[in-house]
Amino acid sequence: MRLNKYIAHTRHCTRREASRLLARGEIKVNNKVVKEESYRVMEGDEVTHLNKPLQEQIVYRYLLINKPKHFTTDIGDKDSKYIMGLIKKEDPTGLIAVDHMGPKSVGLLLLTTDKALVEKLNQKNRKVRRVYLIELNKDIEEKDIKKLLKDRKTLKIESASHVDGYKANYIGLEMTIGSENILKGVINRMGFEIQRIDRSYYAGLTKKDLKRGWIRPLQEMEERMMKHFI
């Protein structure tokens, strides 16, 4: 990493201010004065300002996207568009999706550089509240909806019902344990096919005021709320 960028990442000052410190000869690397902004800081190097150690602080990124249809989080899916293609103004370096969403899935998706958070969210039996609107290939009766609520080791559906204002082939569903792939498998074995699955809520986050295909960083309050819910 370039030295001026490293200094900025310690939150000691901005990158522009770091350039001034370097020009004044106030920065040392391994006890030697360095004035070049382009100097590469290597792992194990000690960087100091006026003999006070500067340590890089990891700043994680959290991006919320309202995913449109035909995009996928699977880079190996040759028949669909990779989700990172939507990120034009953001640096995709290190970003990963918190969970899998295929081409028929739309709605709320979180991208982050925080690998520990992703691992936590995907722990087996970790309860993470998610809300979906699901369009099926045919009408579904109440008796079949009740079958969805059956307890399973790999899937926990908290509620499922028809939705006011939608046809009988739509259901609203809330689950806390399991993946979309597991949910799709259960629905397929019941004789139905999912035409579209739209996620509106995930771990305290919503897609309110976020248009389809749009992306924005999480606000600090949203980040705290999300971590509170998990």
Q: What are the residue ranges of the model-derived segments?
A:
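Basic, flexible Lys/Arg- and Gly-enriched helix-loop patches that mediate nucleic-acid binding at interfaces
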Residues: 1-230
